[in-house]
């Protein structure tokens, strides 16, 4: 670092020289010390394993700017995976990990995070030109808003991963702001023009303050933006659109897919399909079973569906009762970098739209796994809703079947099998009934 400070060598030149010597464990925190002009507010962040935190790490990687991060200890509700730091450790100046309450949306946990961020920021208030906050976890936008109030010149970029105020089933999310003074002070701050938008729902307030005061607003797709604006008047819609940027989740480079070697075994002569992800109310084991069912009924037997998910009694009960379990292998969810490596072993990766027909006017979601799948050597088999963002995506290696066009599952699979030059049927795979 002394050589850099004296101007004898640039940081990039020094890193390149160290790498040329075969040095892999470079202490980037020392090289980056004091360089961050951007502050990232991410309540949940690596090394704690969470989709939102991982995407934030990928945003930092994509942006290529050195940053400081203020996050929170999440050990009570999230597992730790130290390898996740490999995504962006080379761009980290410092990370302050707070010890506030840990919760998805409790007001106590939000207050603790705000207080911790304000305390940390005041020690380095002249350091930053920009801050970036990302939701999910509403804590991040609340803290960013408080910093914006005390430093209006700092650029605030606020990202929304999904619609915030309603969930995938269009149920209202509600978590009370348990501080009447905060609500009244906020109403006074926004003024009479917007005070009616402020209530005691932290999810609503989180969205409103970001819409009004962030300098840039990041959405993952146009339908998400349009859906979130439906409840606002034309003035706010125009304000938000003037600051909106559409940006799908970043994809990591190929070397990240080789960082952890998986020793998972697949039969090379079979067509190996994989599903990675949690099961939810609108996406569960039934979708996997239907793929196996309609392939089997089309006289296709040379395939295995490898499922990596949050195994629990309910899921395993469905699996054990399935007539098609011979074609499905259940596995516990894999750590992030092993998951990336596993994708390369497969012939196709399954991805499903959230089902929103009859629930929402259009589908405002893009499955987060798509960005990781794009970097894999494998093909992607997407099961879509009509006219969703995923349904309208055209890419090499992407095969699309509408979720409820069950009779087309086999034809899409046969096209995939033909493209990878594997048989769809083998006599040795015939299952004899007991």
Model-predicted regions and their roles:
Residues 121-139, 152-159:
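Short N-terminal targeting/anchoring amphipathic segment
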Residues 1-90, 216, 295-298:
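N-terminal subdomain of nucleotide-sugar transferases
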Residues 157-200:
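Acceptor-binding helix/loop patch of EC 2.4 sugar-transfer enzymes
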Residues 65-115, 125, 310-314:
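N-terminal strand-loop element at the rim of the active site
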Residues 75, 197-243:
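A short, active-site helix/loop in glycosyltransferases that binds the activated sugar's phosphate group
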Residues 192-193, 300-345:
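Nucleotide-activated donor-binding/catalytic signature segment of Leloir-type glycosyltransferases, i.e.
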Residues 283-286, 339-341, 349-374, 381-391:
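Nucleotide-sugar-dependent
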Residues 255, 264-283:
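Conserved donor-binding/catalytic core segment of Leloir-type glycosyltransferases
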């Amino acid at each position: 670092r002394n050589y850099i400070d004296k101007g004898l060598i640039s940081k990039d030149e020094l890193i390149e020289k160290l790498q040329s010597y075969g040095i892999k464990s470079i202490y980037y925190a020392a090289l980056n010390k004091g360089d961050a002009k951007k502050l990232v507010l991410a309540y949940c962040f690596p090394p704690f394993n969470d989709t939102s935190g991982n995407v934030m790490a990928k945003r930092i990687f994509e942006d290529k700017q050195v940053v400081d991060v203020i996050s929170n200890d999440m050990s009570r509700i999230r597992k730790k995976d130290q390898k996740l730091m490999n995504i962006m450790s080379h761009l980290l100046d410092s990370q302050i990990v707070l010890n506030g309450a840990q919760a998805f949306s409790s007001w106590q946990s939000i207050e603790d995070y705000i207080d911790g961020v304000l305390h940390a920021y005041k020690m380095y208030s002249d350091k930053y030109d920009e801050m970036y906050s990302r939701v999910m976890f509403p804590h991040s936008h609340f803290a960013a808003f408080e910093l914006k109030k005390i430093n209006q010149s700092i650029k605030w970029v606020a990202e929304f991963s999904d619609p915030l105020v309603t969930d995938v089933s269009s149920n209202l999310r509600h978590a009370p702001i348990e501080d009447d003074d905060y609500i009244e002070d906020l109403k006074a701050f926004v003024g009479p023009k917007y005070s009616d938008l402020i209530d005691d729902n932290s999810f609503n307030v989180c969205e409103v303050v970001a819409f009004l005061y962030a300098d840039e607003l990041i959405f993952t797709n146009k339908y998400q933006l349009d859906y979130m604006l439906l409840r606002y008047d034309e003035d706010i819609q125009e304000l938000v659109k003037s600051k909106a940027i559409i940006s799908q989740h970043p994809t990591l480079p190929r070397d990240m897919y080789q960082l952890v070697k998986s020793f998972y075994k697949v039969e090379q002569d079979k067509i190996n399909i994989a599903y990675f992800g949690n099961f939810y109310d609108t996406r569960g084991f039934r979708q996997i079973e239907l793929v196996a069912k309609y392939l089997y009924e089309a006289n296709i037997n040379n395939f295995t569906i490898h499922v990596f998910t949050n195994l629990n009694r309910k899921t395993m009960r469905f699996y054990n009762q399935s007539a098609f379990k011979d074609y499905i292998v259940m596995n516990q969810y894999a750590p992030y970098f092993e998951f990336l490596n596993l994708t390369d072993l497969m012939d196709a990766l399954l991805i499903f739209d959230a089902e929103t027909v009859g629930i929402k006017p259009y589908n405002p979601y893009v499955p987060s796994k798509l960005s990781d799948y794009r970097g894999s050597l494998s093909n992607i088999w997407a099961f879509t809703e009509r006219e969703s963002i995923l349904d309208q995506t055209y890419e090499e290696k992407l095969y699309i079947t509408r979720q409820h066009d069950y009779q087309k599952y086999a034809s899409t699979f046969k096209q995939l099998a033909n493209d990878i030059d594997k048989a769809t049927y083998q006599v040795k795979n015939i299952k004899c009934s007991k």
